[in-house]
């Protein structure tokens, strides 16, 4: 039984969001670094630091919060894992779904690397749909 690193980072971010934690610590791999760069570029997280501890690298993410009248802080981050090791989901460039009419993003793994749905449509390439973020 293999380990699903993408599901692990999605679960870590979602759990930190529900508990209103400001930071999340996740293991650093090439896939997680690519996904975190997309989250940072799209504005879903504030800051990323790479931390080394006992010859292992970790990424420390600072989550982005917004003020809400009823609650003190509310995170605007919702994540959903789509393709998983037991059921891979692929899409060509014309059938990449739009999340909330373009407000959310789809992260894809393509032949040219991990990218958002907008980048994949511009380059006219499809790939494996990793997750939805809105």
Curated annotation (Swiss-Prot):
GO terms for biological process: translation. PANTHER family: 40S RIBOSOMAL PROTEIN S15A. It comes from Arabidopsis thaliana (Mouse-ear cress). It holds the Pfam family Ribosomal_S8. It is found in: Plastid, Chloroplast. SUPFAM superfamilies: Ribosomal protein S8. This is Small ribosomal subunit protein uS8c. The lineage of its organism: Eukaryota, Viridiplantae, Streptophyta, Embryophyta, Tracheophyta. GO terms for cellular component: chloroplast; chloroplast envelope; chloroplast stroma; plastid; ribonucleoprotein complex; ribosome. InterPro entries: Ribosomal_uS8 (IPR000630), Ribosomal_uS8_CS (IPR047863), Ribosomal_uS8_sf (IPR035987). Part of the 30S ribosomal subunit. One of its GO terms (molecular function) is structural constituent of ribosome. It comes from the Eukaryota. Disulfide bonds: none annotated. One of the primary rRNA binding proteins, it binds directly to 16S rRNA central domain where it helps coordinate assembly of the platform of the 30S subunit. Keywords: Chloroplast, Plastid, Ribonucleoprotein, Ribosomal protein, RNA-binding, rRNA-binding. Belongs to the universal ribosomal protein uS8 family.
């Amino acid at each position: 039984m293999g380990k699903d690193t993408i599901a692990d980072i999605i679960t870590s971010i979602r759990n930190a969001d529900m508990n209103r934690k400001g930071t999340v610590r996740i293991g650093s791999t090439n896939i997680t670094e690519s996904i975190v760069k997309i989250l940072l570029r799209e504005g879903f997280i504030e800051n990323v630091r790479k931390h080394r501890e006992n010859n292992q690298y970790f990424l420390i993410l600072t989550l982005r919060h917004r003020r809400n009248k009823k609650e003190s802080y509310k995170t605007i981050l919702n994540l959903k894992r789509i393709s998983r090791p037991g059921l891979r989901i692929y899409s060509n460039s014309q059938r990449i779904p739009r999340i909330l009419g373009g407000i959310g993003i789809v992260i894809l793994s393509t032949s040219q690397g991990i990218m958002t749905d907008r980048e994949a449509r511009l380059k006219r390439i499809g790939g494996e749909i990793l997750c939805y973020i809105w």
